[in-house]
Amino acid sequence: MLFSKEREMSDDLTKEQRHKNMQNIKSSDTKIEVLLRKALWQKGYRYRKNYKDLPGKPDIVITKYKIAIFCDGEFFHGKDWEVLKPRLEKSNNSEYWISKISRNRERDEEINKKLLFLGWTVIRFWGKDIKKNTDECIKVIEEAIFDIKMGEDKISFDEDGK
C-alpha cells in the first residue's frame, strides 16, 4: 500500500487541510479560558488576560495578588505524558508531535520557574478540569489568595515587632 507524502497525520486530511486546521487552533480566549474568567468575575475577582509583561503571557493574571493562571489543553501540554508519548510513537508523524509536546512541557516548566523567581504564584489547570470542575478551580485560586493574604499579614505583624 502506498502512502502520499501529503498525509502526515493518521487521518484523511491533506497537508493543506491539516495546515488550515492547525491555524484555527486558538491560543487566547479559548472556551476554557472564558469559562474560568467568567467564574472569577462572578466571584468579584478582577484580572488581566494574556498579560504580556510576564514570562509566558499567562492566560489570566490577578495582579493584586501576583497570581499567574494558565489554562492548558491536555494534548498540546502533554497531560499524562507517560501514556500519551507511547501512543504518539505509534502515529505517522511521531517525531514531530513528540518533539513539539516535549518542548511545550519544557517551556511550561521554564515559565513556572521564571514566574516563581519573580515572586509570582503559578497555577495551571487542565482544560477538562476547568470544564468539569470550574468551582473546584475557583477554590484553588481562592486558597492561593488566602495563603498570600496570610503571608502578607505575617510580614506586617512581624515588622511591627509584636
Give a label for each model feature.
Residues 1-124, 128-162:
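Nucleic-acid endo/exonuclease domains
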